[in-house]
């Protein structure tokens, strides 16, 4: 079963994918979240290419931020546009964990940080739900 995960950020959206039959997940892409909403074209391509059964979206439950409303709006748009069930998953500390991973790998690309965060969120959701 294919599952996609989005780490929605104000500037960048990280994307990861999992294949549960293979017990494997990987970061696949980070896309810029711009005010013109051009990112929907890229999300459309990714969803149509992978045809996921579920979509997981990172959500900071323990922290009340303005981003929470934007994440919920993004999640509702996913459901409306693609008719795919989504799940919100606690994303607290996923960026910190991704930064530690990048430090170990001696990579400091902020761009890939978000897709690695998405992978961490996805792995967490799979451990709890699959």
From Swiss-Prot:
Which UniProt keywords are present, listed alphabetically?
Cytoplasm, Hydrolase, Nuclease, Ribosome biogenesis
User: Gene3D superfamilies under this entry?
Assistant: YqgF/RNase H-like domain
InterPro entries linked to this entry? RNaseH-like_sf (IPR012337), YqgF (IPR005227), YqgF/RNaseH-like_dom (IPR006641), YqgF/RNaseH-like_dom_sf (IPR037027)
Enzyme Commission code(s) on record:
3.1.-.-
Q: Name one GO cellular component term.
A: cytosol
* Broad EC category: hydrolase
| GO MF term set | nuclease activity
Name one process (GO BP) from the record: rRNA 5'-end processing
The organism's superkingdom is given as Bacteria
Any idea where this protein resides?
Answer: Cytoplasm
Recorded family membership: Belongs to the YqgF nuclease family.
The protein's matches in HAMAP family, at most eight in alphabetical order, are given as: Nuclease_YqgF (MF_00651)
Q: What does this protein do?
A: Could be a nuclease involved in processing of the 5'-end of pre-16S rRNA.
Q: Name the chain's protein.
A: Putative pre-16S rRNA nuclease
Organism from which the protein derives = Buchnera aphidicola subsp. Cinara cedri (strain Cc)
Provide the taxonomic classification. Bacteria, Pseudomonadati, Pseudomonadota, Gammaproteobacteria, Enterobacterales
Gene label: yqgF
């Amino acid at each position: 079963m294919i599952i996609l995960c989005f780490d929605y950020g104000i500037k960048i959206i990280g994307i990861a994918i999992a294949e549960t039959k293979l017990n494997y997940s990987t970061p696949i892409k980070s896309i810029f979240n711009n005010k013109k909403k051009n990112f929907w074209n890229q999300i459309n391509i990714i969803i149509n290419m992978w045809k996921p059964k579920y979509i997981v979206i990172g959500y900071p439950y323990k922290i009340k931020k303005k981003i929470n409303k934007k994440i919920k709006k993004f999640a509702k748009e996913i459901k409306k546009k693609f008719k795919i069930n989504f799940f919100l998953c606690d994303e607290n500390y996923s960026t910190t964990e991704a930064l530690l991973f990048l430090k170990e790998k001696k990579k400091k690309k902020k761009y890939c940080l978000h897709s690695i965060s998405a992978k961490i969120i996805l792995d967490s959701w799979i451990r709890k739900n699959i």
